[in-house]
Amino acid sequence: MPTINQLVRKPRVAEKAKSKVPALEKCPQKRGVCTRVYTTTPKKPNSALRKVCKVRLTNGFEVISYIGGEGHNLQEHSVVLIRGGRVKDLPGVRYHTVRGSLDTQGVKDRKQSRSKYGAKRPKAA
């Protein structure tokens, strides 16, 4: 416990909060170009083939981004928009691709949570 005199000489310094999404540089989203589109397997105890892509951003960062939803149209040189948000069972994946924006199509036949997957409202039958 420091004395008041010690605190006067050298005040307490608050710890700086470290960003969970440094590549976004305080922006809500960033644009980038896919350099590789592939599948990877999650950590134990989960099992699947998760769709991810490596993206070179406009600021020069190269990050891995998760492609959510069923099916996608991304390939190398596709221009994508990424947002923050990690995938808990994929180490190193700290970003999500935004569906329905730029070259990324929305999810087909999506009825619920449509705004998260870039799907238009279905026509009333």
From Swiss-Prot:
GO biological process: translation
Keyword Translocase found: no
One GO CC term on file: small ribosomal subunit
Chain segments carrying region Disordered: 100-125
Record keywords, A-Z: Methylation, Ribonucleoprotein, Ribosomal protein, RNA-binding, rRNA-binding, tRNA-binding
Gene3D superfamilies tied to this protein: Nucleic acid-binding proteins (2.40.50.140)
Domain of life: Bacteria
Keyword Cell division: no
Function: With S4 and S5 plays an important role in translational accuracy. Interacts with and stabilizes bases of the 16S rRNA that are involved in tRNA selection in the A site and with the mRNA backbone. Located at the interface of the 30S and 50S subunits, it traverses the body of the 30S subunit contacting proteins on the other side and probably holding the rRNA structure together. The combined cluster of proteins S8, S12 and S17 appears to hold together the shoulder and platform of the 30S subunit.
Family: Belongs to the universal ribosomal protein uS12 family.
Protein name, entry field: Small ribosomal subunit protein uS12
Lineage, broadest ranks: Bacteria, Pseudomonadati, Pseudomonadota, Betaproteobacteria, Rhodocyclales
Annotated gene: rpsL
